[in-house]
């Protein structure tokens, strides 16, 4: 689910060549890029929230996608209900809401404009402040009643980054993307000026010039 350009989907297909593997995404542009590389994978354009597979899958796999989808209380049990008996759903999502990099996004949106004024529309600020991924216990409570087993854990990784604005460049492709897309040109520049300065203070370079960036990930493996 959320296959994007299909890199991970092709790895799964190569690992299990006899399986029928379907890559699902809501972006026609992403799927077009995925289809440019021929192979055995089937590609389907659909919304995860309303997706109905042709046949019950043995495995549902999603890597760093479901944090963008609202309504986990409904979607997660719904997905488990699509599995074959004994089927498995494996999910990974970032637990980045409480990290300094993401706290500073919200603070900069709230008061990073001239004279401490907010940036962007109210709707964008609300979306930026929304906590999309809950803590592990909440997902256990949600899934334990609709499955035969739930395995859930967190891992904190440390990225070693290079450059003067290393953390900024890292988050550009993840949590910062909706903000940059939602701001007008002038406000985008104002945001980046303030935000990059705050990031450099929160994540100072080490003695060797590198920057350590810790980030948490939540892993969930559910058996139907």
PLM feature spans:
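A generic structural signal for alpha->beta connector loops
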Residues: 18, 40, 86, 147-149
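Conserved Class I S-adenosyl-L-methionine
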Residues: 7, 127-224
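Conserved catalytic/acceptor-binding region of the Class I
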Residues: 73, 80, 88-162
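A short SAM/SAH-binding and catalytic strip from SAM-dependent methyltransferases
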Residues: 59-72, 95
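Class I SAM-dependent methyltransferase SAM/SAH-binding core
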Residues: 1-51
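Helix-to-beta-strand junctions that scaffold the AdoMet/dcAdoMet cofactor pocket
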Residues: 69-70, 83-85
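A short acidic, Gly/Pro-enriched loop at the edge of an enzyme's catalytic core
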Residues: 49-60
């Amino acid at each position: 689910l959320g296959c994007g350009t299909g890199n991970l989907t092709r790895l799964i297909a190569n690992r299990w060549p006899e399986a029928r593997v379907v890559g699902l995404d809501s972006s026609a542009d992403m799927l077009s890029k995925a289809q440019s590389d021929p192979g055995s994978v089937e590609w389907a354009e659909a919304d995860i929230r309303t997706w109905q597979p042709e046949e019950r899958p043995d495995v549902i796999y999603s890597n760093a996608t479901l944090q963008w989808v609202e309504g986990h209380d409904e979607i997660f049990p719904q997905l488990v209900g699509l599995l074959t008996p004994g089927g498995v759903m494996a999910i990974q999502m970032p637990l980045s809401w409480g990290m300094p990099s993401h706290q500073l996004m919200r603070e900069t949106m709230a008061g990073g404009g001239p004279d401490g004024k907010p940036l962007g529309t109210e709707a964008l600020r609300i979306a930026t402040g929304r906590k999309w991924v809950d803590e592990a216990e909440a997902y256990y409570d949600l899934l334990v009643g609709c499955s035969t087993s739930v395995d859930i854990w967190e891992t904190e990784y440390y990225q070693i980054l290079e450059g003067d604005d290393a953390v900024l460049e890292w988050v550009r492709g993840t949590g910062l993307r909706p903000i940059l897309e939602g701001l007008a040109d002038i406000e985008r520049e104002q945001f980046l000026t303030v935000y990059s300065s705050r990031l450099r203070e929160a994540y100072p370079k080490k003695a060797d010039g590198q920057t350590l960036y810790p980030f948490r990930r939540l892993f969930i493996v559910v058996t139907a």
